[in-house]
Amino acid sequence: MKKETAARTASLMLCLAVWAFIFSNSMQGGEASSQRSDAVMAMVNRVLAGAGGGPVESWALRKAAHFAEFAALGASLILALRCWLPGLPIRRQFPLAFTTGVVSAVFDETIQLFSQGRSAQFSDVLLDSAGVLAGMLAAVLFRQLLRRISPRA
């Protein structure tokens, strides 16, 4: 029972942390967001240059960040549902997690409408939704892999 409660608490805290990260990024003004993206882009380009790769464009980095943060959300949502509703079949958990992720993407873009120097883009909602789906699939596949390696997982 204690292990189940700990897993539920941890999964909920993970979801809340990912949401806080996503929404706090969206609340940044356009100038602050650009400065942060430029700093990350400089670091990524240094690493790529050291590995013999070419530079990454700002728009590509921003889109990759959108996808990655929503992939983390998708993984955390499906994990939370597996912990909180273990009796609910995955075929029912999946649409619930995905819908929650898509609503989060719409909310995220809505926040940006009210952030100075930012705008909302429908294409970002689509990209974020794809990230949610990818994160969910990765989490489910990872769990299946763990079960094959260790039947108690």
Annotate each PLM feature.
Residues 2-77:
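"…centered on the first transmembrane helix and the immediately adjacent amphipathic helix/loop
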Residues 86-99:
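Internal alpha-helical transmembrane segments of multi-pass membrane proteins
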Residues 105-129:
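Interfacial helix-loop-helix junctions of multi-pass membrane proteins
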